[in-house]
Amino acid sequence: QVTDDVVARASEINKSNELLDLEPDHTKASPRVRRIKRPHLAHEFYRRLSAETCVTDILSELLGPNIRLRAGGKVNMKSAGFGSPVEWHQDWAFYPHTNDDVLAAGILLDDMDLDNGPLLVMPGTHRGPVYDHHSNGAFCGAMDPASVDLDFSKAVPLTGKAGSMTVHHVRLVHGSE
């Protein structure tokens, strides 16, 4: 219900703002949200969810006991009937850090199967280089698949039931269709 309430705010705007990234075919009459940016500012539920013991326990097992949660995050939407692909990228390009012990965690708010554009990951790429995310000298937030030596047909979809959690290293190459 919380996510539905936040998404309903899209019917009041014509273009993306500091809270919502809209799909290209969005209209006020037919709201289409691609992403809720900084969801912890939209509703307390998101901050509480990311700090739940069931989440932090899993992250602590992977990283050790002294984890820090980064304020912010986002809620990526893959709504039925529409939903833009996310180009191949590494999260590291968006927020580089001074150490390599950084993970991205996702909690599925709905069931995710092959029909609704799951996250696709390239196993083992977190051990490789950080790829270029520029086009014509400007940061574009995506890799050029033709310029890297990766076989994207080997991508693995991350599917699961609502409430499932995905965790990946921020250097792992990933995207969605």
Model-derived regions: residue spans:
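A short beta-loop-beta micro-motif enriched in histidine and acidic residues
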Residues: 91-102, 153-154, 160
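Active-site region of the double-stranded beta-helix
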Residues: 65, 92, 97-98, 107-118, ...
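Double-stranded beta-helix
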Residues: 112-175
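Histidine-centered catalytic micro-motifs
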Residues: 85-93, 167-176
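Non-heme Fe(II)-dependent double-stranded beta-helix
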Residues: 2-88, 93-97, 133
